[in-house]
UniProtKB/Swiss-Prot annotation:
The keyword Ribosomal protein does not apply. Residues 146-187 are annotated as: Disordered. Its cofactor is Zn(2+). It comes from Streptomyces avermitilis (strain ATCC 31267 / DSM 46492 / JCM 5070 / NBRC 14893 / NCIMB 12804 / NRRL 8165 / MA-4680). Keywords: ATP-binding, DNA-binding, Metal-binding, Nucleotide-binding, Repressor, Transcription, Transcription regulation, Zinc, Zinc-finger. This is Transcriptional repressor NrdR.
Amino acid sequence: MHCPFCRHPDSRVVDSRTTDDGTSIRRRRQCPDCSRRFTTVETCSLMVVKRSGVTEPFSRTKVINGVRKACQGRPVTEDALAQLGQRVEEAVRATGSAELTTHDVGLAILGPLRELDLVAYLRFASVYRAFDSLEDFEAAIAELREEQRERPAVDDEDHEDAGAERQGTDRGSGGTVEVPVPATVAD
């Protein structure tokens, strides 16, 4: 690393620390020639190849802005959007690839967005997957409904007692609830 003051071709690393968000390394350096200190920040560049073939750096802000449009009018907080942006960036960096396509980034967004808000997920998926007809929306909604049907079945198997309690309270005005018989001294 060249010294920015005297242009000496070498420098010594005095201290290294990761930044708070963990995406870069901050290094404190000292020039062996002029003894002045300076700071460098190293980040791993992550490039996104767009459909047009243009390559640009990955931007968490761009991800959040795109998802924000899908969440317009929905009860989604800015904090939740920031967390989603961080999860997406972590997911795409975890691939280990220096270049990703917009398709890869879109796939990384769909999972966390589905967990965040189903309506926003449908809005985003309709653009990302280029829905052309009502059948495309109906198929996506049917997929979400099927997933919701399967999810309580898994939860009930894991938490049978909680499911029994829920079953008794969710029946509404016409349902009956079994009351356990108290134990007697003879038991």
